[in-house]
Amino acid sequence: MRYGEKEIQEFDPKKDLEIWPNKHNKPYKIKITLPEFSCLCPRSGYPDYATMHLEYIPDQYVVELKALKLYINSFRNRYISHEDSTNEIFDTLYSKLKPKYMRLVADFNPRGNVHTLIEIDSEEIEKVSNG
C-alpha cells in the first residue's frame, strides 16, 4: 500500500480533520472547489463522481486544506448515497468549524441519464427551522 492510500484509508475525521484558528476579525468568505469527489453507489456498487463546492464565512476556525482533501478522498471506497455523503460532509465540517455561514453544493456527474445537484445552506436550514 502506498503512503497516500494509507493516509486516506486511515483518515478519521474526528481526530484528523485539522482546523486552524482564524486570525482575522473581519468577515470574509472562503470558497473551495473539490473536483475529484467519488464514492460508491450503495445499490449497484458503481462509482459516483462529483465536484463539491464549499463556501463558508469563518468565525473562530478555518479548515486545513490537506486534511479537507484527505477527508473528501476518504469517501472513495464507501457505499454511500449522494444525499448521505453530502449531508455527512456538511454536518462534519459545520460542527468542527462552527462558521458564521456555510454552503455545500455537490454536483454529481450524470449517470444513467440522471444528474443530481444537492445544496445545503446553513441560512436556509435556519429559516426552515425557525418556520
Curated annotation (Swiss-Prot):
It is an enzyme of class 1 (oxidoreductase). Substrate binds at V63, E64, L65, H82, E83. Its EC number is 1.7.1.13. Pathway: tRNA modification; tRNA-queuosine biosynthesis. Its main location: cytoplasm. GO terms for cellular component: cytoplasm. The keyword Cytoplasm applies. GO terms for molecular function: preQ1 synthase activity. It holds the Pfam family QueF. Keywords: Cytoplasm, NADP, Oxidoreductase, Queuosine biosynthesis. It catalyses: 7-aminomethyl-7-carbaguanine + 2 NADP(+) = 7-cyano-7-deazaguanine + 2 NADPH + 3 H(+). The active site is at C41, D48. One of its GO terms (biological process) is queuosine biosynthetic process. PANTHER family: NADPH-DEPENDENT 7-CYANO-7-DEAZAGUANINE REDUCTASE. Belongs to the GTP cyclohydrolase I family. QueF type 1 subfamily. Catalyzes the NADPH-dependent reduction of 7-cyano-7-deazaguanine (preQ0) to 7-aminomethyl-7-deazaguanine (preQ1). This is NADPH-dependent 7-cyano-7-deazaguanine reductase. It comes from Nitratiruptor sp. (strain SB155-2).
